[in-house]
Amino acid sequence: MIKKEYTFIDLFAGAGGLSEGFIKAGFSPIAHIEMKQDACNTLKTRSAFHYLTAQGKLSIYEDYLKNKVEGTDGSILWNQVPPEVTNAAICATIGEDTINGIFKKVDALKGDKTVDIIIGGPPCQAYSVAGRARMGKAVDEDPRNELYKYYVQF
């Protein structure tokens, strides 16, 4: 029996904690979508780490860590792996005006693979007790309340 490679897309990926769990469980990421640049940089770095580990070239990652210059974005490491590895981190805000462009990027990354699962953690401020207390009645009008609907579109 041939083992199927299970794939996922991570929406509202943050720095990739949920992705890390799925990767450790044997899933392969197709895309991580996150709006914050620092988190996207972390996603690119972790993608490079996983690629280099699979290729038996972890020493490249270790050298990067030893020689990393504070304030750099990681491009020294990212240039050591094929572009499609780091391109899996899509730095974009998910919304009506961006969704079609995101779909195009995901489709290009996906190729002929199927997506087995959509994962992600939308911003919790509008759901959490602390967030609701802080925002008061404005919580009902917070657009983050509606972000879960994008899971269906993917």
What annotation goes with each model-predicted range?
Residues M1-F154:
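Conserved active-site and SAM-binding loop architecture
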